[in-house]
Structure formats: structure tokens, C-alpha cells
């Protein structure tokens, strides 16, 4: 039979160990949801939608770079860039995979706390322009349209008219997105 002093010391050590484990910082890491994966349900973490230039895979994969820049944040990244995109899919409502993509993007945009729109130079991105227009009044957009984007003037005028936050560089975009996600986390996802 163990002595009461030894048992007390063991319990005390166990309490200290438990407190240390509880106090250890959790490793933050984003959950990345790529279309057409299902959107998470009842996930309280802030969500960011990475909208903008894809050009059916022809634009640089800026979404991957921004996702890496968020790698230390406990957020959900909603990425519409599909690695399995098939150029043979007709852009029509009766094309099942095309419809699935559009419906996924619409749902992801609605569920996002922060919406990024990056309009890469040399691209046209008409669907991203449409999505920007749909969400210009929502207060969730952060937009980067550098010189060389096909309709930079339209983006600039619309952003000014509706108070959309614009940035000038990818570094500024990253900083603005990180701050907006931190603000969303502080407010609480379902507080809006």
C-alpha cells in the first residue's frame, strides 16, 4: 500500500503536468477546402474565399501562395481553383460539373467572412468581376487589381463607389486578409 505522502506527491505532479499541457499553445493551421469538397457545417472558425484570377488554370496559382501565408492561422480557406478542372465541361447550367462548381462558389462566397478578389495582370476574370459585383456592398471584400488587369478601371470605380477595401501589392493583400480574419475571429463567426 502506498503512503499518503507519495500519493499526494503523485497527484500534485499529475496536476502540474495537466496544467502544463492545457497551457501549451495550440498549433494553428488552416483547413483548406477546395472545390468541390463540401463546405464545413457549424465550424466557428473564420472563413476566407480566395476569388479572382484562375483563367481555367492559366493564371498563376496565387491561391496557393496566399494559403501558405495563412498557414499559422486557425481559419478555413475556401479555394475555388480545382486541380481536376476539365476544359471540355460546357459552361452551361445543364453541365453537371460546371453547375457543381458554380453552386459551390456561390455557397462558399455566402459563407465567407472575408472575400479576396485578386485580378492578375494579363487576365480577364469575368466571373470574378461578377462575384465582386455581387458582394461589393457586403463589407467582406478585399481587392487587389494591379496595373495590367483587363478591367482595372471598372474594379477601381466600383470599389470606390461601394467602399470596397483595395490594396496595391500582394504583401498588402496578405496583411489585410490576416487582419480581417483576426478581426472576424475576435468578433465570432456567427456574430454577423
Segments from the language model and where they lie:
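Conserved catalytic or regulatory cores that recognize and/or transform ribose-phosphate-containing ligands
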Residues: 17-192
Amino acid at each position: 500500500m502506498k503512503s499518503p505522502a507519495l500519493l499526494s506527491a503523485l497527484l500534485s505532479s499529475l496536476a502540474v503536468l495537466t496544467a502544463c499541457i492545457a497551457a501549451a499553445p495550440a498549433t494553428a493551421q488552416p483547413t483548406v477546402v477546395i472545390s468541390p469538397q463540401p463546405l464545413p457545417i457549424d465550424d466557428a472558425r473564420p472563413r476566407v474565399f480566395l476569388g479572382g484570377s484562375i483563367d481555367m488554370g492559366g493564371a498563376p496559382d496565387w491561391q496557393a501562395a496566399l494559403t501558405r501565408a495563412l498557414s499559422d492561422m486557425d481559419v478555413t480557406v475556401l479555394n475555388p481553383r480545382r486541380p481536376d478542372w476539365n476544359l471540355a465541361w460546357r459552361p452551361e447550367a445543364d453541365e453537371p460539373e460546371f453547375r457543381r462548381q458554380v453552386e459551390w462558389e456561390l455557397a462558399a462566397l455566402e459563407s465567407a467572412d472575408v472575400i479576396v478578389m485578386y485580378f492578375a495582370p494579363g487576365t480577364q476574370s469575368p466571373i470574378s468581376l461578377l462575384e465582386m459585383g455581387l458582394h461589393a456592398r457586403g463589407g467582406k471584400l478585399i481587392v487587389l487589381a494591379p496595373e495590367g488587369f483587363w478591367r482595372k478601371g471598372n474594379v477601381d470605380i466600383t470599389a470606390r463607389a461601394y467602399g470596397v477595401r483595395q490594396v496595391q501589392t500582394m504583401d498588402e493583400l496578405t496583411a489585410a486578409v490576416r487582419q480581417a480574419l483576426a478581426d472576424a475571429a475576435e468578433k465570432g463567426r456567427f456574430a454577423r
